[in-house]
């Protein structure tokens, strides 16, 4: 039996930043969030992330299932603008305290 890890590390996710809810001048739509993915700057680069899963991980005061950490899952739906921002729908709407915090954008499911 071999101890330790052999070969290269596999990258499972990239980091993203939650910018806010999708909105117009006077209305906001909390069922869709805007996320800036690190290293993505154009609409063409966003197309690879379409359909990918993302997770907002946060820490709660009370334990559930033996852990203080909880997760809200989401999915990249489409690009937003020309600067590499994506629109994402989450299973439940993100809380307002999540604005500006990190999200994990996973490299699966693959559509290659």
Swiss-Prot record:
Cross-referenced InterPro entries, in alphabetical order?
A: Ribosomal_eL33 (IPR001780), Ribosomal_eL33_CS (IPR018266), Ribosomal_eL33_sf (IPR038661), Transl_B-barrel_sf (IPR009000)
Statement: the UniProt record of this protein carries the keyword Ribonucleoprotein: yes
Biological process GO terms, please? translation
| Superkingdom field | Eukaryota
User: Where are the membrane-spanning stretches?
Assistant: none
Short name of one Pfam family for this protein? Answer: Ribosomal_L35Ae
Single GO cellular component term: extracellular region
What are the UniProt keywords, alphabetically? Ribonucleoprotein, Ribosomal protein
GO molecular-function terms, A-Z = mRNA binding; structural constituent of ribosome
The UniProt entry's sequence similarity note says: Belongs to the eukaryotic ribosomal protein eL33 family.
This protein is called what? Large ribosomal subunit protein eL33w
